[in-house]
């Protein structure tokens, strides 16, 4: 089984990362997106065929977690996912 990658935050930067991964050949089955806005969930599922879940579930299931949120939101996101993070996971911050 390939490693799971989660993208938490699906704004412009998060979607750009997602789009690049899909275009480069990454299987959508190996990608999870954490997004809280209902309209974005539907949009991303229809456009890319990815699984969109809550942030905590995405972080729990993934081997690599890309945090693509605004700096002022980072503390809240980290507090939300901290209980499910485990040794060996790779966290990448793309906060901007």
Where are the regions a protein language model picked out?
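NAD(P)+-binding Rossmann beta1-loop-alpha1 motif at the extreme N-terminus of oxidoreductases
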Residues: 1-56, 60
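Rossmann-like NAD(P)(H) cofactor-binding subdomain of soluble oxidoreductases
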Residues: 38, 47-48, 55-96
């Amino acid at each position: 089984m390939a490693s799971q990658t989660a993208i938490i935050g699906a704004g412009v930067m998060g979607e750009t990362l997602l789009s690049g991964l899909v275009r480069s050949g990454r299987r959508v089955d190996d990608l999870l997106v954490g997004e809280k806005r209902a309209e974005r969930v539907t949009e991303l599922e229809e456009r890319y065929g990815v699984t969109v879940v809550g942030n905590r579930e995405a972080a729990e299931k993934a081997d690599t977690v890309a945090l693509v949120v605004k700096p002022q939101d980072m503390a809240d996101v980290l507090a939300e996912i901290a209980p499910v993070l485990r040794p060996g996971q790779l966290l990448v911050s793309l906060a901007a």
